[in-house]
Amino acid sequence: MVDYDLALKCVRLCQEIYRDFSGLRFSAYPDIDPVFVESQDNGFTDTQVAILNQLNSDRLYIVFRGSDKSIDWMNNFQFRQQIYPYSDGNTEVKFHQGFMTAYFAIRKQLLEAMDNFVGQQVIVTGHSLGGALATIAALDIQYNLGKKRDLSFEVYTFGAPRVGNQAMVESYNGRIPNSYRFVYGWD
């Protein structure tokens, strides 16, 4: 069941992540300890994500920034779907090539950072491209660290495009049952 207070907090966090990343502090949330991860300036991606550990709580937020620069839009238009195994490679799961390019730019750093947390309720969120990356990250982290680190997941996305084929949807729904995709009209 949707927690609308949590959804509203996710909206605010998604809004905050669009600020200048170098000066971002989430000062409206003094009980949050942030870790920032961004892709290296390689000319192919501009992926930015904040991992926010809510102090005195078992809650952790992963907030992805959406399309902000022209390089983001170039990745958005790489529609072709490809198999990107997040597991053993024997899969029919396919993902949007551009979104995976953006995700893989920060994947290693993100998984390394997430390996430091145990027993957390992980709230993954993002707007637009950030919502697509949140969807991919939740599936990847759940598969690779979820049981090992005793992590539970909820996903709140806003205006997120679809990221994969039907096999991906089935895998995702089986692993992330608490996922809420908010769209407006024909989003």
Regions found by a protein language model. Name each.
Residues 1-125, 129-187:
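Non-catalytic, mobile gating and regulatory segments of ester bond hydrolases
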